[in-house]
C-alpha cells in the first residue's frame, strides 16, 4: 500500500483568545479564521495520511480542525507554557495527526538532565495492512538570537565540519547550536534502535548540509574509525524519483525547492527522513510552496514555511 506523510510548520498556530510570546502579538478573530481556512485548504491539497505539525500553541483547535478533515487520531505530548495573567503563550509544541490508529506513544529517551526545547513525539501507528510503523515528529532548537554558526556546502567533509564545530563549541559561539546538536544526537540513538520502518517528520532549524544532519543521521559522526558514511536515517528527497517534463536543452539538473527564506535566500529547513526499511520505497516527494512564491516571508495567516509531502510504499 501507499501512504503519504508530511511535515507542516504552522507558523504561530495560536487562537485569537491568546497572545504568543508577547501580549501585543495576537490574531484578530478574522485573521484567525482566515489562517484556519488556509490550513484546511492546504491539508486537503496535500491529501496526506499522517502529518507532523510544528509551532502549535492552540492544541484543541488544531485537533478539531484535523478531525473535521477525516484524521482519526491526534496526539500531543507536551502543553505550551502559558503566562496566565496576560494569557500569553511562551512556548510551542509539536503535534501528530493520523488517518490510521495511533497504537502507542513513547517518550524519546534522554540522558542525564538533558531535555528537548520542544518535546518530540514518538508514535507507533498501525496501517491497514497490519504493518506497524514508528513516526517521530520534531522541531529542533532555532537560532533565534542569530548567533554565529558555520555554514557548509555539499563539498564540505565531515572532518572539516567537526573541526569547525569543535571551535564553535569551545568558544561558545552558539548555545542554540549546542542544544540543537544534543537534540539531533538524542533522536539519532533512539531511532537507531528501531527494528522496523521509521519516519522522522521535522523542522530541523538547520540547513541541508549542516553538521546537525550528520549528528542526526550518520554513525561516522560518532565513530571516527569508520572510513565511510554509515547512515541510520536517509533524506527522502535523495531517494524520490525525479520528474522532468519537456526538459529545456540547457537543463542543468534539479535544484532543491527551499522550504523557508531569510533575507531573500532560500533554505531547506523542513525534512522527512526514513530509516533503512523505507529508503528504497520512496515513490514521490513534493514541496507545497505556492504561498512562498507569492511572498517569500509568508504571512501569519498562512505560514512562513513550505510543506513537505512524501509518498511511501509500505
Please place each PLM-identified region on the residue numbering.
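N-terminal, active-site-proximal structural segment of metallo-dependent hydrolase catalytic domains
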Residues: 1-72, 78-92, 161, 185, ...
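Short, solvent-exposed beta-strand-terminating loops
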Residues: 2-18, 130-157
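Active-site beta-strand/loop signature of hydrolases that rely on acidic residues for catalysis
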Residues: 8-10, 39-63, 123, 135, ...
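Short, solvent-exposed loop/turn and secondary-structure capping segments
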Residues: 16-19, 63-64, 107-109, 146-148, ...
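Short glycine/proline-rich turn/loop motifs
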Residues: 20, 164-170
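Structured beta-strand-rich core segments of catalytic domains in phosphoester-bond hydrolases
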Residues: 50-52, 56-145
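Metal-dependent phosphoester-hydrolase catalytic domains
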Residues: 107, 115-116, 124-126, 189-199, ...
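Surface-exposed cleft-lining segments at the edges of enzyme active sites
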Residues: 168-178
